[in-house]
Design a protein with these regions (language model features):
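Hydrophobic alpha-helical segments within soluble ligand-binding/sensing domains
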Residues: 71, 132-165, 184, 226-233, ...
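Flexible loop/hinge segments that line or gate small-molecule binding clefts
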Residues: 102-140, 144, 156-169, 173, ...
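Hydrophobic alpha-helical
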Residues: 85-109, 113, 189, 211-292
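C-terminal motif of bacterial Sec signal peptides marking the signal peptidase cleavage site
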Residues: 18-21
């Protein structure tokens, strides 16, 4: 009888524990993306879902659709609804106005806030002790891309100088105006390549359209899209081609999505189709699955890897810290963190293929 009572007591205890466990609410991270349509952001979103799940967190994802007004209202609604942590891939980066408003919403409610990918200023992060940023160093991608371009051109210069004028003509697709990543990728990709070319006794790159004083073509919708690059490239090839002896000899893209669009236009003109077909070197940034496949198939030259998985790991750690009541930057020693501001840096890497 005594043994039976003990067994019954143990069963009741186990049932009580199970009921408590079942009743415990799963904490949630509210994640705000500047747009779902960005290829790299889609890879971050997929990786982050997994990392949050592995840490026992659920998530609600919001599509800003490229509108800061939409995103700010989404954040406001989430805060009003009792959000525990906000992960924000901000839409507008041209000024601090939007970030300031979002910080105000989070700070007034005491909700931890992490900006990611699209960088906000140090002043924004330091304005709230429960705010941080996870992303890359904006200039690094441009420098690495420029090095890749310089290395490749110097190894294949004569065959790439299609009209034999001793200079390489290029077209460059910029993802967005006013965005630090786009600004620095545009600037340093060309500057670094020129530095290497001139050190080797070669002439600097020449933008294909001398009437374009900006020396880039920008996605006017700020979406870094394949469609914008495809349209620009298709138009450019109607006047700059082999028949006119002024073929564009190099394509530089701020991201892999734009590289995909440019390659589609080149394919239509008989270039970059793989299997020994004539090819124009195309460089991107992100190392998306599509770009990796294009490089493998000989249709794209190289890209700069932006580590979506690494970014997701850092974001999930900070989200877990926030929901568990820990210091926001707890256990971040394995990451590269700026000395004077709570900014975690995810490194880039060159990628020419496996």
């Amino acid at each position: 009888m005594k043994k039976r009572l003990i067994s019954l007591f143990l069963i009741l205890c186990l049932c009580s524990v199970a009921l408590v466990g079942c009743g415990r609410k799963k904490e949630k991270a509210d994640v705000f993306y500047y747009t779902f349509s960005d290829t790299y952001i889609s890879s971050v979103r997929t990786a982050l879902k997994k990392e949050l799940t592995d840490r026992g967190l659920s998530s609600s994802d919001y599509d800003g659709s490229g509108s800061q007004t939409t995103q700010t209202e989404q954040v406001r609604t989430a805060v009003t609804g009792g959000a525990k942590v906000l992960l924000v891939n901000i839409v507008n980066t041209g000024s601090d106005d939007a970030a300031t408003e979002i910080v105000g919403l989070a700070k007034n409610a005491g909700v931890p806030l992490v900006f990611f990918n699209r960088e906000v200023s140090d002043g924004i992060v330091n304005s709230y002790d429960q705010c941080a940023f996870v992303g890359t160093r904006a200039e690094e991608a441009g420098i690495l891309q420029g090095e890749m371009i310089g290395e490749y051109l110097l190894a294949h210069y004569d065959e790439l100088d299609l009209n034999g004028d001793g200079r390489i003509s290029y077209i460059l697709f910029k993802g967005e105006e006013g965005n630090n990543e786009a600004i620095y990728r545009t600037k340093y990709s060309v500057e670094k390549a020129n530095e290497m070319l001139m050190a080797a006794g070669k002439k600097p790159l020449r933008f294909y359209d001398e009437s374009n004083k900006n020396e880039y073509l920008v996605d006017k919708n700020g979406q870094w899209s394949a469609a914008a690059a495809n349209e620009y490239m298709t138009t450019a090839l109607t006047t700059h081609n082999a028949a006119n002896k002024n073929m564009i000899e190099l394509v530089i893209c701020n991201n892999d999505g734009m590289a995909e669009g440019a390659i589609s236009a080149l394919n239509a003109a008989g270039y970059n189709t793989g299997a020994g077909a004539p090819a124009i070197p195309v460089f991107g940034v992100d190392a998306t699955e599509a770009a990796v496949a294009l490089i493998r198939d000989g249709k794209m030259t190289g890209t700069v890897k932006q580590d979506a998985a690494g970014m997701a790991k850092a974001l999930a750690l900070l989200a877990a810290n926030a929901t568990e009541g820990k210091a926001l930057m707890d256990s971040t020693g394995a990451f590269s963190v700026d000395e004077t501001v709570r900014k975690i840096r995810i490194p880039y890497a060159k990628y020419f293929g496996e």
